[in-house]
């Protein structure tokens, strides 16, 4: 019985052993089959591990176009000379290459440090500069190689490196030839002439190539150039971000504004090279141009608006009290989408030349005055502080210890519509007073609180005032929100004379009045590659205006009366179905740069849209410091009105 059991056990062991062997062969066969069937994949992986690949020096970025397809920003090929190190090349051979290049191309002379390095490589590595005792200390490891090299450099005198001009240039070329990784291309000189470029190529100098790199060119000069933004090398602050995104530190990227905002679409793909064993570069992938950025900007309209601003600033300077008047802004958009058609800022400098300050539209703020009353009157509607259509007598308000506050003139009887049409401050004051729970009486105290200010600011923000517009330009700032709580400042806030707003905030506000919705402003219309649309802008609604449609309709009607019979009667051609609001405000300047405001000025503004129903255009115009506080002149009145009228005339003529 024992023998039988033992035999059975031995058979089982043999069976398990044979089964294991068979299973191992099956697994091996499956693995071998997988490897054979995927041989190209593994060959590629092996190649990636055993070969070195490098990118080309640059690739063309995508163009920037206007809404009609006109090219605004393009790329220009720059003829550039490069050196690719040859495996096993000797120093004397590289110096010969440098001398050959120096005879063809013009480069700057070497720096002192470069000249000292040149001296060492051409003088037995400076061995004569080190004493025998110092060499002994080095051999005894009492001083290191770093100390030895430092001593050599310190002992090279000015006379030793007093080379002629040609030699100094050769020293600089040699230094450029030996920068960076051994297998990477070294830029020797860029923007060479056609003749120099041809000579370098014809000379067939070992390791030297002539290639085209790409730089931005602006087809309309400085127009919108600061809005486009800059491109350049990766900055130290952004190094980690770009490296994580797969960039190389030598890459050119968008550094600001539109170039930065749409970097991921505008960037091109550089050519790819395989590094052969002799360091020769073999191209395996061609470069690819980036996608084109199409803007909502109409460049013809943009240039016309720029021209109008320059003309009207120049004209205004002929009037009195305009010492501080030098800037003007105008923005035009589609109020139902937020698409910007023109965005302009012009400044007259002391040398009577103009500069483009269009970026101030997103990062510089002003008190806008009565032009924001379309939003402040909304507080009265929402909280039932006014009765639509009911008339009151326009008058002045006198609070305790505060000088009386009035409209710019006595307006007689006004209701909500005519108060907007004729810019009654008194009507707005009554809304603010009613908000505090008081009934007006002379020399009263309102006891205004933070909550009263918040009520106004929440409503203003609902229209886009005091908050970012979310325009697709990095660096947008909001205006200044006053921190002091006081009775008179609540009244000031109600007439747009306390907080400050940027020009784009004013634009978003008037668009919100027109549509009933606060939409982000945008410059990007679409991004495309040839005829294929990669990304298309979509209307981005940030919030609905915090007001019912009946009240919004009432506000629009009041703004229509502004242009037909009120303070804006001469801002646009008569008979045009236009809605808008004029504004004047008190501003303060620091004229002697001592950090303290010392001069009171008057600024004017306008915000409007037309037609008043289903509008096609919205316009804001701002003319800061157009006059002195102590003397309103014709220049004050002409500021925003003349600019607005000229822009509207052009729009009617062309569109």
Pin down the residues of each PLM region.
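A short acidic/glycine-rich loop-to-helix N-cap element
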Residues: 625-640
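Membrane-proximal periplasmic segments of bacterial cell-envelope enzymes
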Residues: 2-260, 264-281, 285, 328-329, ...
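Solvent-exposed, polar/charged alpha-helical surfaces in well-ordered, non-transmembrane soluble domains
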Residues: 92-99, 103, 198, 202, ...
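Short edge-strand/loop segments of extracellular domains
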Residues: 88, 102, 527-532, 645
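Short, basic/aromatic recognition patches
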Residues: 43-56, 301-323
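Beta-lactam-recognizing serine transpeptidase/beta-lactamase-like catalytic domain environment
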Residues: 71-74, 272-286, 297, 301, ...
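Structural motif corresponding to the C-terminal cap of alpha-helices
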Residues: 41, 308-317, 348, 439, ...
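Short, gly/Ser/Thr-rich active-site loops of penicillin-recognizing serine hydrolases
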Residues: 534-536, 638-655
